Curated annotation (Swiss-Prot):
GO cellular component, one term: periplasmic space
Gene encoding the protein: rotA
Highest rank taxon of the organism: Bacteria
Location of the protein in the cell: Periplasm
Domain (PPIase cyclophilin-type) ranges: 21-181
Full protein name: Peptidyl-prolyl cis-trans isomerase
Keywords, ordered alphabetically: Isomerase, Periplasm, Rotamase, Signal
Broad enzyme group: isomerase
Function according to Swiss-Prot or TrEMBL: PPIases accelerate the folding of proteins. It catalyzes the cis-trans isomerization of proline imidic peptide bonds in oligopeptides. This protein is not essential for growth. Presumably plays a role in signal transduction.
Endpoints of the signal sequence: 1-20
CDD domains, per the entry: cyclophilin_EcCYP_like
Its EC number(s): 5.2.1.8
């Protein structure tokens, strides 16, 4: 009997490990943020983000749009507000059952639902109006902050101004120093 229990528990541990999500650490000049990617519920978006991380794309970019009680957006601009060249856009996964709640990470996009590339945002509040519905394609959630929401809140409340055509730009750059994968999902 004990042998059967040990075999079942061993199988469960292997299954749980195979379903584990990728963990990412984002270092900013205001502190660190740890993020869990939802590889199984948002495979396209999570893989896309991981690809940019592996290519060091986010290193040296900024949070270029921050709005208190809404969200912080980054992943596309350098400190001089020069937009970085990206890979091709991905399919919108906003109908994956995940909601834009406080602390979740979602893909930023244009009015075209399938236009997301490298830019992402972290919800600072529950933003249910960003979820997919019958009349709106929504914004795909693909991860969640598991440590460092105090840093996210600090970023969301920095003084902002307008920079050219861009509104809500931090007066002092909020830099993404590096983004690194801490552990990776091995499930196929």
């Amino acid at each position: 009997m004990l042998k059967r229990v040990a075999i079942v528990l061993g199988g469960l541990l292997i299954s749980a490990h195979a379903l584990a999500n990728t963990m990412v650490e984002m270092k900013t000049n205001l502190g660190n943020i740890e993020i869990e990617l939802y590889n199984n519920k948002a495979p396209i978006s999570a893989k896309n983000f991981e690809s940019y991380v592996k290519n060091n794309f986010y290193n040296g970019t900024i949070f270029h749009r921050v709005i208190p009680n809404f969200m912080i957006q980054g992943g596309g601009f350098e400190t001089n507000m020069k937009e970085k060249a990206t890979a091709a856009p991905i399919k919108n996964e906003a109908s994956n059952g995940l909601a834009n709640t406080r602390g979740t990470l979602a893909m930023a996009r244009t009015s075209n639902p399938d236009s997301a590339t490298s830019q992402f945002f972290i919800n600072v509040a529950d933003n249910n109006f960003l979820n997919a519905s019958r009349t709106d394609a929504g914004y795909a959630v693909f991860g969640k902050v598991i440590k460092g929401m105090d840093v996210v809140d600090k970023i969301a409340n920095v003084p902002t101004s307008t920079y050219g055509m861009h509104q809500n730009v931090p007066k002092q750059p909020v830099k993404i120093i590096s983004v690194q994968i801490k552990s990776i999902n091995t499930a196929k």
